[in-house]
Amino acid sequence: MQVENLHTSVACNRCTECADWGPNGWIAYGACNAIAIMDPKFQGNSAKVLFTLVEHTKRVNTVRWLDCDKLLSGGDDAIAILWELDETGTTKSFTLKGHTSGVNTVDGIRQQDGSWLLATAAADTTIKLWTFQDNNYVCFQTISLSDGFCFCLRLQLLPKSNQVLLAFSGDDETVSLWSEQVETAGEGDSLGRQFQRKHKLTGHEDWVRGLDFVVDGEDLLLASGSQDNFIRLWRIAPRSKEQMQENRVDLHQLSHNDDEIKVEEKILQLGKEAWYAVSLESVLYGHEGWIYGVHWHKTPDQELRLLSASIDKTVIIWAPTEEGIWLEEVRVGEVGGNSVGFYGGKFSGDGHSIMAHSYQGGFHIWSQDPDRPQLWTPGVIVGGHYGEVRDLAWEHSGAYLMTASADQTTRLHAPWLQDGANPTWHELARPQIHGYDMQALALLSRYKFASGAEEKIVRTFQAPANFIENFRHISGIENDDAGDVLLDSLPKGASVPSLGLSNKAVYKVDSEVESTSKTSKDEYPDNYFVPIALETPPQEETLMQNTLWPELQKLYGHGYEIFALAATADGSLLASTCKASNAEHAQIILWNPSNWKQIQKLSGHQLTVTQLSFSPDSRYLLSVSRDRRWCLYERQDSSVSYQLVASTDKSNGVHTRIIWSCDWSHDGQFFVTSSRDGKVVVWKKEEDCKESSLNGWQANGVLELKNESITAVAFSNSYLSGTDDTYILALGTETGLIKIYQFVRGAWKLLSDLNKSQAHHLTVRRLQFRPGKQLQLASCGEDHLVRIYDIKLT
């Protein structure tokens, strides 16, 4: 069996040094405890996460490309990892251990002898310097910052020299410059290399969050971006011994508390006969918020460009005039929407594209127009959830996948069909942006769904006309009778009013109100909707505010937070459950989506019902619970009401711990349950079964995985190719693994075992096979990842 990763969706971690654009054209970024490697030019004009690197055990805080095949990362698990990777994703990794707290910034540089000098800074108030050569690493120095904290650091080789300069910023609003000295014993024997402090650059009035070096002829330029909204450019220029003697300033007599801007040159001795002058080149002001990232780029003509990213939702490219005055050349960013701003930005290797990642983990990419260099246009990018993904559901024909997350959003993922290219998957809409963490969802039809969050209400939504038009165009949807019926009657879109949680429908007439009737408040609404005809998948800015679905109805009836939802295949029934500690609240409520009225309440469980599943023909409703039992309800003839017909108890229940998941086979002959006790049980109705509470249902096959908790299970939508009695099941575990099994006549056979790099590195929350002829599996987990796999049987 071959399993190919068709789609991976995940957001960038909320850290300032957490994304980098490498010289190989790939973007690496921290994604929960993993590192995602994305190709932003996949198939020319698309984007795709190629693979993930999993070794960190806590959140990844920082990533830094050192070369085309070397990547350095640091995480909250107090380690840094040096990765060596090739185009296929095959990696070797070397773990740098020594810190006692989370590593928050890293850098590295290749030296003239071919070895690597690496620097790591952590929350344990230390900076560690390492050498790496021939697959061996050594920590040769630890710089203690006393009670200080390092936000950013950079290493740089001085031009025409093997001398290394270390710059780092701390919580004292300064930038420290250190250089290496070779210490010798009294008789001239070398004791080894050590870095010593040479100077502190003062002037900023708040923490410095971004640093970057660039070589300018024989000089170095250092850019520092600060939370005081200013960028300072520092020039480090070589000086002869004669110049040094004329201009020398005794640095040791400078007060460390002198906050005054010092424009005069400061002479540094970096080596025995190497003298450098440090001076303030320029101060740039253009941002209205904290500056979190700066990045240099040198054009083929040796012209310098500086990129700055700020929490004020803008990214600026700065360029010097002929007179040497630095001016703003390009400004891009977000407008409107529920966003905070940018946590970092980078140039591509050729400088014709720029990337920024936001507080909510979304990526933005802009590319320079070849014909009009001053025009930068937004491009297609991959994003995802920035919180644990708790539920997913396929549209009934497999046209799209919808996911719900603790980041308070539901997102719709669909393929982008282009002529002459394989489809690539992208986020096409964000139907719900809520004020509560999302928990569950169920699709009622192609353009209607219900969702539950950490509130007592079930909310239902219907797609607006603008989404239907764009969805058809991007995904190549034809023969869409459901959409044809809705197009003329539906609102164009939706928006969320100030201080509201409900998506309010926006009709065409809303935008045609005479301007004379508008108050100043109405002219600039907090969240607005403008119909857009999309040719490509939408950018993050559009997704945040222009792809909401109008809310149809709120369903009241539960006493606690919604926990699980399920709908029949035809969307004629909706079932919901909530968190419960007694039988009254553990009841399942059935709703009629045609009039949104309660049909009945189903009793049977004592504690929270964790998952629900209707049989393909809607005859049965299966529920599993925290009370370690499953209940089966059967639909009464010519009625919409259900009745409890089978359940397990202490004497006949196979499971001994909470039952997390359940599913039906496509033919309705079997259902499966999985539990924290590591057991997966397939149940079938047998005529000769004597157990009264089971009413003929009995365990047909039990799979037990020792020391595993099975948190998700799913049947495929067809038999194994060429058979009429062989089923395929997928299991997800608490450790993040996905296992695919063949099940035939009570026997299990493992077909494929996906490791943490291929699957998830935290708990798998939901699995579901895509409806249709293809064998494709969707998964989501607590690691923020949503994945779609294409499975080929060999």
UniProtKB/Swiss-Prot annotation:
SUPFAM superfamilies: WD40 repeat-like (SSF50978). Disruption phenotype: RNAi-mediated knockdown is lethal in larval third instar (L3) stage. RNAi-mediated knockdown in sensory organ precursor cells abolishes central spindle asymmetry during asymmetric cell division. It comes from the Eukaryota. Keywords: Cytoplasm, Cytoskeleton, Microtubule, Nucleus, Repeat, tRNA processing, WD repeat. PROSITE patterns: WD_REPEATS_1 (PS00678), WD_REPEATS_2 (PS50082), WD_REPEATS_REGION (PS50294). Folds into a two seven-bladed beta-propeller structure which is required for elongator complex assembly. This is Elongator complex protein 2. It comes from Drosophila melanogaster (Fruit fly). The gene is Elp2.
